């Protein structure tokens, strides 16, 4: 920053000095040298080397010779470059449309073009927000109308024998009222219905089975009916009587591959009877053997009076009954 300020300061001083020196042309500048030797040196002329100016062959027009050859090639390269640029731009637009189908420039452009098309009708055009959301609301509006027609037969009013008075106006439902607040074109005036003569048919019931079948079941299930009984014909075989069915049960069992075939016993031998292994003999008691007290019990009984805090204390009565030391001593 100081260097720039110093530079501009010197330039201003030089300009001011040159302006003031215009009135005195005979005055020499301060950097002029009055040495006579320098004036003689300034009179010396140095020879300049001859330089060729212009083309070496001025009569030959190189541009006219090369241009017809190189210009088609240049045009081809330029066209290829433009084509590549157009393909890149188209690929970019396609990727943007796939990633964000509602935020691309082309979609917005088409949307505004559709909105700016002149209408042939004389009715008032709906608002902009309604025209934008109309493609999304039309399917729901159609389904709502169809459902309203189907639900017209369901009522909470009890059935009576008298014919109710026919209504002359139709009122919009709750959803239509809600949508009409944001979309004025959906507002409709109450339509007059021609008065019908009273009929003798009763009013629909609250739980009409046909209505519920039509709402909650498929068409093929609703239209399914019980198959009629086949009519007797000379070509139809009547079913066999019950007695004959009992007789043919053994014959039919032979054709079942998952049951035993009784005819196979003619080609096989009977299996040997299953016998148990012989039981061991009970040893005969020796009358000359001296018994040594009570026999040893196979299962030790647990002392109910056993105290783990005093393991050495034992009940002599229980020890005797269990065949312990007391029993062996007394035996």
Swiss-Prot record:
The keyword Secreted applies. The keyword Cytoplasm does not apply. One of its GO terms (biological process) is response to osmotic stress. Its main location: secreted. Keywords: Secreted, Signal, Stress response. Coiled coil: none annotated. Disruption phenotype: Normal physiological responses to hypertonic stress, such as accumulation of organic osmolytes and activation of osmoresponsive genes, are constitutively activated with mutants exhibiting resistance to normally lethal levels of hypertonic stress. This is Osmotic avoidance abnormal protein 8.
């Amino acid at each position: 920053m100081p260097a720039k300020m110093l530079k501009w300061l010197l330039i201003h001083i030089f300009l001011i000095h040159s302006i003031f020196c215009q009135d005195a042309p005979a005055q020499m500048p301060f950097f002029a040298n009055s040495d006579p030797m320098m004036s003689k040196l300034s009179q010396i002329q140095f020879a300049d080397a001859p330089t060729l100016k212009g083309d070496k062959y001025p009569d030959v027009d190189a541009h006219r010779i090369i241009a017809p050859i190189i210009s088609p090639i240049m045009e081809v390269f330029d066209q290829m470059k433009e084509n590549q640029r157009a393909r890149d731009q188209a690929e970019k637009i396609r990727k943007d449309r796939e990633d964000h189908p509602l935020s691309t420039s082309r979609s917005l452009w088409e949307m505004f073009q559709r909105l700016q098309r002149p209408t042939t009708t004389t009715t008032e055009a709906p608002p902009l927000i309604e025209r934008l959301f109309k493609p999304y609301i039309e399917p729901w509006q159609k389904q709502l109308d169809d459902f309203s027609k189907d639900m017209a037969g369901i009522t909470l009013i009890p059935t009576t024998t008298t014919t109710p008075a026919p209504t002359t106006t139709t009122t919009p439902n709750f959803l239509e009222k809600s949508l009409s607040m944001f979309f004025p074109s959906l507002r409709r005036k109450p339509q007059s219905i021609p008065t019908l003569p009273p009929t003798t048919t009763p009013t629909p019931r609250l739980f009409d089975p046909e209505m519920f079948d039509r709402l909650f079941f498929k068409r093929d299930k609703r239209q399914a009916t019980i198959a009629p009984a086949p009519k007797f014909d000379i070509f139809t075989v009547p079913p066999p009587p019950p007695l004959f069915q009992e007789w043919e049960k053994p014959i039919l069992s032979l054709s079942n591959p998952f049951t035993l075939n009784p005819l196979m016993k003619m080609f096989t031998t009977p299996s040997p009877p299953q016998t148990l292994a012989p039981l061991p003999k009970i040893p005969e008691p020796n009358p000359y053997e001296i018994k040594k007290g009570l026999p040893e019990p196979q299962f030790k009984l647990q002392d109910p009076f056993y105290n783990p805090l005093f393991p050495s204390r034992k009940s002599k009565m229980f020890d005797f009954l269990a065949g312990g030391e007391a029993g062996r001593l007394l035996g």
